[in-house]
Amino acid sequence: RMLDKHCTLYQDIVRVPLILAGPGVEAQVNDNLVSNCLDLPVTLASLLGFAPPEGAHGQSLFGPARKTITSSGNGQQFGMFNSRMITDGHLKYVWNLTDIDELYDLDADQGECHNLIRERYDSPALKALRADLYADLKAHGDPFIRHGWLDGQLLGERKHKPWRESQ
């Protein structure tokens, strides 16, 4: 039942705790920020008083809070990884290029065992996550978005829906 989880986008893997301490860091703060490991170089540079590295994809954890975060693996040297995900901390959408997409309610299903993609395929919340994922992948030159030929699939217009054929 967990064979269709694709790559390594499990919530237990992509949601990693972080502890920061030192000058300029507020003590005893427990925050459920939506962030990315790519935010660490930018955050550390800002704490040390440096400008962020040119072309850095992250943003400082001490700046404006994000509403969503994306995750993708472009490890073509190790194989073909064709899943991308976005979460707002409550809903998690996984775009699977060659298979059925995944949608999880992280508040109700922390183990990501009940894929809601069929029930909520046309929901405004999912459409918003797809649009945000597309914008982020486009901004960072993701190889599946770069040339535009998969835009319709990610944005939901041309995604194959095998569960609708059986009805």
Predicted regions and their residues:
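Active-site rim elements
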Residues: 5, 24-35, 48-51, 113-120
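Conserved beta-strand positions that form and line the central face of beta-propeller blades
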Residues: 9, 18, 30, 60, ...
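C-terminal cap/loop subdomain of S1 sulfatases and analogous C-terminal strand-loop tails that border
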Residues: 26, 38-41, 45-106, 111, ...
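Histidine-centered active-site microenvironments of extracellular/periplasmic hydrolases
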Residues: 1-26, 36
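A contiguous, mid-protein "functional segment" used to position or interact
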Residues: 117-148
